[in-house]
């Protein structure tokens, strides 16, 4: 199948069948508008408790949707027809923390001791941004979202430690404010941004070269806005070195049967004023950038 084909209007069941039959292996950004998309982390049961606690301690980077019992391939909470071993466009396989290979299904790798964690994804709030009149650059350019390793530390838990990975979308200052307001409603899709403005403040030295995904144009009147990202566990896995782990490939998500709106916590009519919103979201704000938005006073 042509990976450049727009799939926004394709019914979810048809899209899932394409993925299951290895006919679509591309990024799912912009696909199945309005449906919750999810990251996957699959670990041996002996590592599962520590990772569960890691997710609980780091809900922005790893917003937990659900977790399976060992060996289970299905989760009724996210979809009656979803097979966790076939319904992701591409999986990444790690041994001792090192990436080994990419596969399109897990039939030869599945084990009865494997526990699957389903984590929320920022692709889930894309439709809300678009419905509010905002443009998402990577979708407009037909690309995967830009993702970066950072210097922002996660809270450690047992065997697991490491730094955030973030996704980036550029906006004008006015649109950035609106994007912050909208995405705060979706904590299970990473919620409000963790940073905007100068990327070097979070350890990104070259914004034109993402660690994952694709580079997009950032116009002179735009600022980069950074959200927590479900690729964070892959960064953590490289440091924590479990003997075996499977994840989704960055930008190639599990699309669930649940609507993103089911996980919204705040009606858009009742959004707080931005200064209070930022305080409550605990955002990292570059005050120089904040001054240009009228948010910071020295």
Curated annotation (Swiss-Prot):
The keyword Cell membrane does not apply. SUPFAM superfamilies: PSTPO5379-like. The keyword Ion transport does not apply. Keywords: Lyase. Pfam families: D-Glu_cyclase. Its EC number is 4.2.1.-. It is an enzyme of class 4 (lyase). GO terms for molecular function: lyase activity. InterPro entries: D-Glu_cyclase (IPR009906), Putative_hydro-lyase (IPR038021), UPF0317 (IPR016938). Belongs to the D-glutamate cyclase family. PANTHER family: D-GLUTAMATE CYCLASE, MITOCHONDRIAL (PTHR32022:SF10). This is Putative hydro-lyase VFMJ11_1458.
